[in-house]
Amino acid sequence: MEQIKDIFKQVRQAKGSLAFCKEEIINDTLYALADRVEAATDRILEENAKDLAAMDPSNPKYDRLKLTAERIHAIAQGIRQVATLPSPSGRILSEAVRPNGMKLTKVSVPFGVIGIIYEARPNVTLDVFALCFKSGNACILKGGSDADFSNRILVEIIRNTLLDVAHLSPYLVALLPAGHDSADALLHARGYVDLIIPRGGKGLIDYVRQNATIPVIETGAGVCHVYFDKEGDVAKGAAIIRNAKTRRVSVCNALDCLIIDVNRLTDLSTLCSGLQQDNVEIYADDLCYNYLKTSYPSHLLKHASTDTFGTEFLDYKMAVTATMTIQAAVAHISIYGSGHSECIVTENDRAADYFMKMVDAACVYVNVPTSFTDGGEFGLGAEIGISTQKLHARGPMGLEELNTYKWIIQGDGQIRQ
């Protein structure tokens, strides 16, 4: 435990060096990091293969754990995009002069040290560092033991780049040892860590929220819905449903439940037809089951149970239910949704407006799949996570969400009466 505490102290000490680091140096470091990551593709894949060998390929985490040359290139491009974005730190948010001549300035500043606890997602290691570094924060990483080989090689590349290019302390990033003890230490590192952000499934997020003694921003699980309205376009709907469900089933913005207006049940087979090609299992309520049983493969069609709705599948599985009205659809989402991403397919402006106003989620879509809930797609570069809470940050969290603010008060000897 003392060894972990020493890491906390060193990171806390190192973060002060960023306050005087020019943005040009930060950007040069990020560009160099992207180049070095791509140059080390073969080494990274070798280490990643060790992690993959220990995991069952049928595990939903397997796809998130797996790195490829294409994915490494995409991660590097994300780092480069972060380098092109303006730093939020030091930005003047407001200014005022009080009647006594005292000047008040509200300035954005980094949190300081951010702790990230995440599962088998080695891409998070690089994404988090890039965003923390650009926004003026140091970071302490607690990755899942499933990705330990991958994370260690990536942190090694980051630290060497910090030393070689920026001549900064390698303790601007630290990777904690595998195991629950280091995770618990991080959750209780009050005085060393300013903020904890968990990235993973519901179990991890609940554990962090219930045990942390320092502030937490939840990047919650995604139970995402598409509601096909009575005035929805079938071609758009079929494309949106398939993209939202099958583009990457293991991510939090993937579709979990299709809600269809009862007046459009005759179109249900067409809306779901593309899912057959990806062997998506459908768990349908009784009404929808009867409309699908003559067209959807019997081995892929199942009756919904009481546990079906509200489940984040992270797999080639999807729930289907029908509602009488848009109000009933919104009510269903309010009960079973997680506040992540929700979509309506409709050509009716009034229906779209109602859905946008009444659905309580971080991201609400009209005729666009939930798969777009992503920092890169929102123009934020990489993302540190997708917040499903309402305080401080909501939705994809980029650079701006990694800053808070402080007040600068300047005067000439004024005293309060």
UniProtKB/Swiss-Prot annotation:
GO MF annotation list: glutamate-5-semialdehyde dehydrogenase activity; NADP binding
Catalytic activity: L-glutamate 5-semialdehyde + phosphate + NADP(+) = L-glutamyl 5-phosphate + NADPH + H(+)
Record keyword Amino-acid biosynthesis present: yes
Principal location class: cytoplasm
Xref: Gene3D superfamilies: Aldehyde Dehydrogenase, Chain A, domain 1, Aldehyde Dehydrogenase, Chain A, domain 2
SUPFAM superfamilies: ALDH-like
This protein's record includes keyword Repressor: no
Keywords: Amino-acid biosynthesis, Cytoplasm, NADP, Oxidoreductase, Proline biosynthesis
GO cellular component term of the entry, any: cytoplasm
Biological process, per Gene Ontology: L-proline biosynthetic process
Domain of life, source organism: Bacteria
Enzyme class: oxidoreductase
Pathway: Amino-acid biosynthesis; L-proline biosynthesis; L-glutamate 5-semialdehyde from L-glutamate: step 2/2
Enzyme Commission identifier(s): 1.2.1.41
Compartment annotation: Cytoplasm
Similarity field: Belongs to the gamma-glutamyl phosphate reductase family.
NCBIfam families associated with the record: PRK00197.1 (NF001221), proA (TIGR00407)
Role played: Catalyzes the NADPH-dependent reduction of L-glutamate 5-phosphate into L-glutamate 5-semialdehyde and phosphate. The product spontaneously undergoes cyclization to form 1-pyrroline-5-carboxylate.
The protein's name in its UniProt record: Gamma-glutamyl phosphate reductase
Lineage per the UniProt record: Bacteria, Pseudomonadati, Bacteroidota, Bacteroidia, Bacteroidales
